[in-house]
Amino acid sequence: MNQDKSKETSELDDLALPRSIIMRLVKGVLPEKSLVQKEALKAMINSATLFVSFLTSASGEIATNNNRKILMPQDVLNALDEIEYPEFSKTLKKHLEAYELALKEKRLKLPNVSDVDNRKKAKIDAHDTTPLDEEKDELEEERIAEDIAQNEVEQNIDDVEDLEEVNDTLDANAESPQIETIHLTDATGNPIEDSSESDSEESLQLNDSS
């Protein structure tokens, strides 16, 4: 017997409502500077937990009798009447109406789903399409600039090669100058060999002139 009672107490403690919430409810009802013993607060917490469990069970039976698996607010209100708490039913109904009104106002303040989707789509289009076009333009400009730079490099290479060929020709001419061969002949046209410099100057003639 004691074991069963201890088990029930343990299960009730596991399902107990938060102590802070119950304490706020107690302070909101009792006069100021009222004191609550620890055992009294514990009893209130257990009572609140039992009441919620009892009300849930009664509401579930009403939903089942109406062939529904979903528990509706009206089921809870009807359950309060069945467990003989009609005054709670009236108060709870007012709170539910205020809650539904607040939800309705909140929905009206929220933007339309289609408008949100359109704005998101516009942002995606602006984010994805524009950068792609700009990227294509930038790539085209870079390609043109590279072509121009490549042409300039090739032209410079050709100019350097031409200049090197000219320099090579000049260097070759400087290293091996062309010497015109002159044949010395006498008055009759016979070649003169081993003649002195003075004699050579007097009888110097080009073969072409003969």
UniProtKB/Swiss-Prot annotation:
User: Cellular component terms, GO, for this chain's entry?
Assistant: chromatin; cytosol; epsilon DNA polymerase complex; nuclear replication fork; nucleus
Residue ranges with Basic and acidic residues bias: 121-130
Give the Acidic residues compositional bias ranges: 131-140, 155-168
Q: Which CDD domains match?
A: HFD_POLE3_DPB4
Residue numbers spanned by region Disordered: 121-140, 147-210
UniProt entry keywords in alphabetical sequence: DNA replication, Nucleus
Q: Which GO terms describe its biological process?
A: CMG complex assembly; DNA damage response; DNA replication-dependent chromatin assembly; DNA strand elongation involved in mitotic DNA replication; DNA-templated DNA replication; heterochromatin formation; leading strand elongation
Q: Which SUPFAM superfamilies match?
A: Histone-fold
Family matches, as InterPro entries:
CBFA_NFYB_domain, DNA_Pol-Epsilon_Subunit, Histone-fold
Please verify whether the record's keywords include Nucleus: yes
The annotated consequence of gene deletion is: Decreases H3K9 methylation and impairs heterochromatin silencing; simultaneous disruption of dri1 exacerbates the effect.
Q: Which Pfam families match?
A: CBFD_NFYB_HMF
Q: Where in the cell is it found?
A: Nucleus
Q: Which GO terms describe its molecular function?
A: chromatin DNA binding; nucleosome binding; protein heterodimerization activity
Would you say which domain of life the source belongs to? Eukaryota
Its function, per the record, reads: As accessory component of the DNA polymerase epsilon (DNA polymerase II) participates in chromosomal DNA replication. It is required during synthesis of the leading and lagging DNA strands at the replication fork and binds at/or near replication origins and moves along DNA with the replication fork. It has 3'-5' proofreading exonuclease activity that correct errors arising during DNA replication. It is also involved in DNA synthesis during DNA repair.
Q: Its quaternary structure?
A: DNA polymerase epsilon is a heterotetramer consisting of cdc20/Pol2, dpb2, dpb3, and dpb4. Heterodimer consisting dpb3 and dpb4. Interacts with the replication factor dpb3, cdc20, PCNA and rfc5; the replication licensing factors mcm3 and mcm4; the FACT complex subunits spt16 and pob3; the CHD1-type remodeler hrp3; the SWI/SNF chromatin remodeling complex subunits snf22, arp9, arp42, ssr1, ssr3, and ssr4; the histones H4 and H2B; the histone chaperones Nap1 and h; and the histone deacetylases sir2 and clr6. Interacts with dri1.
| Name of the featured protein | DNA polymerase epsilon subunit D
